[in-house]
Amino acid sequence: MNIHAATPEHSPLGKTVSYQDQYDPSLLFPIARQTKRDEIGVDEAALPFAGVDIWTGFELSWLNARGKPQIGIATFRIPAGSPRLIESKSFKLYLNSYNQTRMDGIDALAAQLARDLSAAAGAEVAVSIALPQAFAAERIAELAGECIDELDIAVDNYAPCPEILSADSTAIVSETLCSNLLKSNCLVTGQPDWGSVSIRYTGPKIDREALLRYLIGFRRHNEFHEQCVERIFVDVLRACAPTKLTVYARYTRRGGLDINPWRSNCDAAPTDNVRTARQ
């Protein structure tokens, strides 16, 4: 593991790799957040948001002390204030390295995951693991908010364009808007990433048609999930001047992992972590 954060092009993305089934934390590939934050004028020493990247690992498996396979669903919470994010394919390869690794128990596994991921991210990563007897409690729900996807608009731009965002300064509101039409593409491979996004704010009333066009504008944009959400947050904050703003996206899984970035200037943490139907 190179914690000096190499560039995405050096990651396992788009490359043929061998799958290791014995524990190997060196598979993790951290990437500095600041490089992409520079593009949107954000300094990690003075972030305009708090936040967390919630990852769900649906394909976690290991061996118990007697060699019997075990499974679980893991939730990882990586602080947005960490200097590094973790590239998703390397994350998958790292989790796969537990497949033939014996662990003394669920607590030991969670502690080891947290230790390795915290070292990679440069900040404390919280880990929880749901065992099969808890799977029945898993539920599905859509993101909160009024969906704007049925607005009858014409669209001819498929790149982020914050200039089209606008808000009515004579109408101050508190509302939550959401869309299931968020699509971006992997920064390295160009593979499509599908998501839903919720925007909760207090401030001048945002033009909904303009917001929907703006979100659709990510359709040909190549960036990691976390970077897209931070770009949305910063663009809406600057163009529409809300006093309170929370942006929360939930992306469909790839390689057994989904990524759900959450950014806010008014809340300490997301109130829920419920997967959507597409997840």
Swiss-Prot record:
* BP terms from Gene Ontology: queuosine biosynthetic process; tRNA modification
Q: Which residues bind substrate?
A: I86, E87, S88, H225, E226
Any GO MF annotation of the entry: preQ1 synthase activity
Q: Which reaction does it catalyse?
A: 7-aminomethyl-7-carbaguanine + 2 NADP(+) = 7-cyano-7-deazaguanine + 2 NADPH + 3 H(+)
Look up the record and report any one GO term of the cellular component aspect.
Answer: cytoplasm
From the Swiss-Prot or TrEMBL record, state where the protein is found. Answer: Cytoplasm
Q: Print the keywords alphabetically.
A: Cytoplasm, NADP, Oxidoreductase, Queuosine biosynthesis
| Keyword Nucleotidyltransferase included in the entry's annotation | no
Which residues are catalytic? C186, D193
Task: Tell me the leader sequence span.
Answer: none
Entry keyword annotation includes Protein biosynthesis: no
What InterPro entries does the database record attribute to this sequence? GTP-CH-I_C/QueF, NADPH_dep_7-cyano-7-deazaG_red, QueF, QueF_N, QueF_type2
Q: From what superkingdom does this record's organism come?
A: Bacteria
Q: What does this protein do?
A: Catalyzes the NADPH-dependent reduction of 7-cyano-7-deazaguanine (preQ0) to 7-aminomethyl-7-deazaguanine (preQ1).
Q: Which HAMAP family match?
A: QueF_type2
Entry protein name: NADPH-dependent 7-cyano-7-deazaguanine reductase
Biological source species: Chromobacterium violaceum (strain ATCC 12472 / DSM 30191 / JCM 1249 / CCUG 213 / NBRC 12614 / NCIMB 9131 / NCTC 9757 / MK)
Per the record, the gene is: queF
